[in-house]
Design a protein with these regions (language model features):
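Non-catalytic connector elements of ABC transporters
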Residues: 2-23, 28-29, 274, 286-400
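ABC ATPase nucleotide-binding domain helices that frame the ATP-binding cleft
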Residues: 80-83, 179
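ABC ATPase nucleotide-binding domains
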Residues: 68, 107-266
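The feature captures the beta-strand-to-loop junction immediately N-terminal to the Walker
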Residues: 72-74
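Helix-to-loop junction immediately C-terminal to a conserved catalytic motif
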Residues: 87
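Conserved ABC transporter NBD signature motif
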Residues: 95-103
Length: 400
């Protein structure tokens, strides 16, 4: 795979920083290069520090035409700082922001032709909806007829055609956010930037509005970046997700791969739920889980004498009565401590059961169909197919 020259040149000398090598490797091996034409936006080796706090470290990513990308991560991971650098509201200490082949790193925000929607809407309280939406059009000197036509077109697009004369304090939170979205896209920006646009709304409004945002974005074929800490939000509407942690990119991938093929232990922990158990490699191609339960992984390059962490999702588990003998699955003895009714499914909280003793430090979550949940026994077993098990090395990087 050909690495873009701008990215290749900017990365020279990075390998000298040993403490960052792992994260750089993770970023580069999951970096998705454009397959069909040039990128709309490239972020090349961006770094940012606030006094003694390293906010961003060697950030590399791209945005394609019509693509919806989410920056996902916990508070303080650097996702909003990265968005602000792309928007021109912050300047990086090092690196470049390239839009349609032009270096815009030092270009002011108003000249970048990006629409921005903030968490707090930022509508002008003294202007009505029509005037709020038209604010950017007035600055670009649209004539009156064009402005009226564009505002009405956008009100139809956000499905609020009759509120043009209302003021922000007369609107619900969801309506205000839709007006903020209309204002951002009114001047036909090249890129739309969304900074946690739904976090101030209640759950049902968020669900409806995120689908509306995605629908509008798709209709306009508008390249979009959204910052969020909500996993479901990012996975449900994004073409790709950028998972960030402590100022670095852990993984850039499709929502499907982020969930089913996490490249680091952090991604596996942060996205959904995963059960982790310690394991070590005493003989080639085999892990001893908890020191005594064999797990055969013939296709994996395990190093004898090394410790590993293995994990599996709650929904891939099958509850069985006996310890199986097949080598294609991992069997674990468990005792069910409590359950939660989830409608069609039931969540079980279990402890590994060794020599008749519950191992409190080895607690597991599993999910099964409610119809398969009959009764609790003193000792039961779970079955996990080997191909659905994830193995991570001591540095937290995935082997499978």
């Amino acid at each position: 795979m050909q690495i873009p020259s701008s990215l290749q040149s900017s990365l020279q000398g990075q390998n000298q920083k040993a403490e960052l090598a792992g994260h750089l490797l993770s970023t580069l091996t999951t970096y998705k290069y454009p397959e069909h034409g040039p990128s709309v936006l490239e972020v090349v080796d961006i770094q940012k520090k606030f006094q003694h706090f390293q906010a961003l470290t060697h950030i590399n990513l791209d945005l394609k035409a019509g693509e919806f990308v989410s920056f996902l991560g916990p508070s303080g991971c650097g996702k909003t700082t990265l968005l602000r650098i792309i928007a021109g509201l912050e300047k990086p200490d090092y690196g470049k922001v390239i839009k349609k082949g032009t270096d815009i790193t030092l270009l002011s925000a108003e000249k970048r032709h990006c629409g921005i929607v903030f968490q707090n809407y930022a509508l002008f309280p003294n202007l009505n909806v029509e005037e709020n939406i038209a604010f950017g059009l007035d600055k670009k000197k649209w004539d009156k007829a064009q402005r009226i036509q564009r505002v009405q077109q956008l009100l139809e697009l956000i499905e609020l055609p009759d509120i043009a004369k209302k003021y922000p304090n007369q609107l619900s939170g969801g309506q205000q956010q839709r007006v903020a979205l209309a204002r951002a896209i009114a001047p036909n920006p090249d890129i739309l930037l969304l900074d946690e646009p739904l976090s101030a709304l209640d759950a049902q409004v968020r669900l409806n509005l995120r689908q509306r945002i995605r629908s509008i974005q798709s209709q306009l074929n508008l390249p979009t970046i959204m910052v969020t800490h909500d996993q479901e939000e990012a996975l449900s509407i994004s073409d790709r997700v950028v998972v960030m942690n402590h100022g670095v990119i852990e993984q850039i991938d499709t929502p499907h791969n982020i969930y089913y093929k996490p490249q680091t232990q952090f991604v596996a922990k942060f996205i959904g739920t995963m059960n982790f158990l310690k394991a070590n490699c005493a003989v080639p191609n085999q892990l001893d889980v908890l020191g005594f339960i064999p797990l055969n992984l013939e296709q994996q390059k395990l190093k004898t004498g090394q410790n590993y962490s293995m994990g599996f999702r709650p929904e891939v588990v099958e509850l069985v009565d006996d310890f199986g003998s097949d080598k294609e699955s991992l069997y674990l003895p468990i005792k069910v401590l409590s359950t939660e009714f989830l409608g069609a499914k039931r969540r079980l909280f279990c402890a590994i059961h060794i020599d008749g003793i519950e191992q409190a430090k080895h607690l597991l979550q599993i999910e099964i169909e409610n119809t398969k949940f009959k009764s609790l026994q003193e000792l039961m077993f779970i079955k996990v197919p080997n191909q659905l098990i994830h193995v991570f090395d001591q540095q937290g990087y995935a082997l499978c």
